[in-house]
Each structure stands twice: as structure tokens, then as C-alpha cells.
A protein has these predicted regions:
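STAS-typified acidic loop motif
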Residues: 1-28
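Short, glycine/acidic-enriched loop or turn micro-motifs at the edges of active sites
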Residues: 18, 48, 162, 175, ...
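Amphipathic alpha-helical interaction surfaces in cytosolic regulatory modules
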Residues: 18-91
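Conserved N-terminal boundary motif of the eukaryotic protein kinase catalytic domain
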Residues: 99-107
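ATP-binding pocket architecture of kinase catalytic cores
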Residues: 106-107, 112-212
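Active-site Asp-x-Gly
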Residues: 266-317
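Helix-rich C-terminal or lid/interface subdomains of diverse kinases
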Residues: 306-383
Length: 383
């Protein structure tokens, strides 16, 4: 019987059949492994287990009474036995992930954190590039469901899958494409798509969330500000904190990364597929986080939009400004400046966390942040 001790977690690998004939020797072997190791969490990996009977279940009951145990990689057949006998309500039991091959799949969208593929005519798969933690992905799916039941047009996943050493989620979506692709493919409908984009943002930012478990983005910005405090002088740090303090707390949704690669078009309806940054808070945070990919990254790294979006920097900036004009119903440079101010807090933080070696971007964003902090005493944008 194989096992692995990783930190304070002991994983034991079971295989074959766990029935009345094998239960006693398997139980004895489990106790030998347990006795020889120091651990806090006990995990049973059942990827190679074909069947479990009531005798095997009784062994798990006895172990549960003594240890903090969980079960992972249970096949569908084995998981069904756990579910029918009520074990899934008393133990943490995870099904084995379905494995899929994307060798011949078409890429229909990509970003910093994920890539979206069309698996077949009915199904798309979002593959996570920077996390292999199923718990983090399950958290995003819970956030997506919260948005969906609140009336936000959100694509709901039906399966978590494994692609090599990466994880992904499947969505049933017919005849869909990213909003980025739709805009580039149907230039004659640019204004129509832009109007729908602005309406989607408005819908998100005016929909109240009653679930206290959804994170508050303002608290996240306080954390960002504390993290970059060593990069700011005292005067501008205190001014930035004062302006964050002045923003009214809201319980309306903020997507947090709603650029047009994270939106799908299906039958002319816009649907969100990337929900890991969902939170509640003031709409200025929504518009500030959009300034980053459309404009801010280009300021110290020309050509960034070409590489990330496949469009010219000036076109990305034009799209963002046109989007704000529709959102507010006017072209107001003061409102845009105040949004930029909040955006540069995010940008200094992003650079500090992800590309600390990029001194030019840090100095550029910090300099523009200082200028706006000196210019404005509030971040009121009329919302």
C-alpha cells in the first residue's frame, strides 16, 4: 500500500476492491502506516479503487472517529456508493476529475489567468493557467452562482475537469464567441456591442448582493494600499487612504476584471465567464480595474494591448473612453481622472506583486498617482 507524507498531511493510496475479503488486511495496513507517521490530516486517494462494500465503509467510519480524514479521487461508481449511503454528508469526499484532451481544441479567448477553448460545438472549457487548487476553482463557481441567482447574466459551469497538470471548468455554450472576437469580427456592430457592454456593467454595479460571504472590494484596496506603503511617501499614502475612506460602502456587485475577453456573446446576449474577482463595493472600483488593461499597462509598456488584446493601444484606449461616456451619459474628464487615481493604486500594487523588477512601470504609475492625489481632494464620480 503506497502512502505519502507531505507536511502534516498523510495520503494513503487504496486500490482494487475494498470488500469483506480485503477489509481486514487493508485496515491493518492502514494502521501500520498511521502508527509510523506523524500527521494532522489523513487523506485517502481512491483513484485506483474500483469498488467499496459495507465492510470497507465500516473501516472509514472507525477511522473517522479517531482522525480528521478526507477522501479524494473517488471514481463515479465509488462516489455513488458514498452518496447513497450518506457518507458524503459526514465526510469530505471528492470525485475524481474527468480528464480531457485539448490537443485539437480551438482557442477562443485567453488572458493572464486563464485560456478558453471550444471543446465541441456545445461545450467550451476555461483552463486555469495559474492555479491547480480545486478549492479555489470551486470558490469561483460559488461566486458565479451567487451572481447568477441575483440576475447577473453569468455562464454556469457543469463540471471541473483535468487537462494534464492544469484544471478547467466546462460550460455548455452554443454558437458563442468572446466579446473581443465579436467586436473585431463585426465592426459594423461596434456601437451596438459597446452599448450592451455598458449596460452589462450598469447591471452588475446596480444589483444588490445580500450574501455577506461575498468579499468587499474596498477592504481589498486597503490591503493593496498597505502592501505598497513602502513604495509611497507618507504624504501621498495618507491622502490615498483618506480618499478610500471617503468612498461610501456599497452592497452592489463589482466584477473586478470585466474586460471584453472575459465576456462571451451567445445569441446576442453578453455572459460573464470569469468570476473569481467578484465582490461588492462602489462602482469606481469596477471602472478603475478596467482602466488597467485598456490603458494603464500601455503607458509604460507600449504595445501591451496588441499582445494582450490583439488591438492597437490607441484602439483599446478609445474603446475604454467610449465605454465610460456611455456608462455616465457624458464625457467628463474630471470623473475619468478620479477613476484613474483609484486605478493607479491598483497598478502600483499589481506591479509590486507580479513584476517588481519593472521599475519603469512602478515609477510611471506612482508618478501619475502622485499627480492625481495632489490635484483632487475627493473621488466623487456622481454615483
Amino acid at each position: 500500500m503506497d502512502f505519502k507524507l507531505n507536511g502534516d498531511t498523510l495520503t494513503i493510496y487504496l486500490e482494487g476492491e475494498f470488500n469483506s475479503y480485503s477489509a481486514e488486511p487493508i485496515e491493518n495496513e492502514i494502521h501500520k502506516i498511521i502508527k509510523a507517521n506523524n500527521f494532522k490530516k489523513l487523506v485517502f486517494d481512491l483513484e485506483m479503487l474500483r469498488y467499496i462494500s459495507s465492510a470497507g465503509l465500516r473501516v472509514f467510519v472507525k477511522l473517522k472517529q479517531q482522525y480528521d480524514i478526507s477522501i479524494t479521487n473517488a471514481s463515479l461508481e465509488v462516489y455513488d456508493i458514498f452518496q447513497m449511503t450518506g457518507f458524503t454528508s459526514i465526510m469530505n469526499i471528492k470525485k475524481a476529475l474527468r480528464k480531457i484532451d485539448l490537443k485539437h481544441a480551438e482557442v477562443i479567448g485567453n488572458g493572464f489567468f486563464s485560456t478558453v477553448y471550444r471543446l465541441d460545438k456545445d461545450t467550451i472549457v476555461k483552463v486555469f493557467n495559474r492555479t491547480s487548487d480545486p478549492g479555489q476553482i470551486e470558490r469561483e463557481l460559488r461566486l458565479a452562482k451567487e451572481a447568477f441567482v441575483s440576475g447577473i447574466p453569468t455562464a454556469i459551469s457543469f463540471d471541473i475537469v483535468q487537462i494534464g497538470d492544469k484544471l478547467g471548468v466546462c460550460f455548455e455554450m452554443l454558437d458563442c464567441m468572446s466579446l473581443k472576437t465579436a467586436v473585431q469580427t463585426h465592426l459594423d456592430r461596434f456601437q451596438e456591442y459597446l452599448n450592451k457592454y455598458a449596460a452589462l456593467l450598469k447591471k452588475i454595479n446596480t444589483t444588490e448582493c445580500l450574501n455577506p460571504a461575498i468579499p468587499d472590494i474596498k477592504k481589498f484596496y486597503y490591503e493593496k494600499l498597505e502592501k505598497i506603503k513602502p513604495n509611497l511617501d507618507d504624504k501621498h499614502y495618507l491622502k490615498a487612504k483618506q480618499l478610500l475612506d471617503s468612498l461610501e460602502d456599497r452592497k452592489t456587485f463589482v466584477h473586478g476584471d470585466c474586460h471584453f475577453k472575459n465576456i462571451m456573446v451567445q445569441h446576442d446576449e453578453l455572459l460573464l465567464i470569469d468570476m473569481d474577482t467578484l465582490s461588492v463595493g462602489h462602482p469606481i472600483f469596477e471602472l478603475a480595474t478596467l482602466y488597467a488593461p485598456y490603458c494603464a499597462f500601455n503607458e509604460d509598456d507600449p504595445g501591451n494591448s496588441e499582445r494582450f488584446f490583439g488591438i492597437k493601444d490607441e484602439d483599446a484606449s478609445t474603446l475604454y473612453n467610449a465605454l465610460l461616456n456611455i456608462y455616465f451619459g457624458k464625457d467628463d474628464p474630471v470623473i475619468k481622472d478620479k477613476i484613474r487615481l483609484v486605478a493607479y493604486i491598483h497598478m502600483v500594487w499589481w506591479n509590486h506583486v507580479n513584476t517588481p523588477e519593472n521599475k519603469a512601470r512602478l515609477e510611471g504609475c506612482r508618478g501619475r498617482l502622485y499627480k492625481l492625489l495632489d490635484q483632487y481632494d475627493d473621488v466623487n464620480i456622481g454615483l
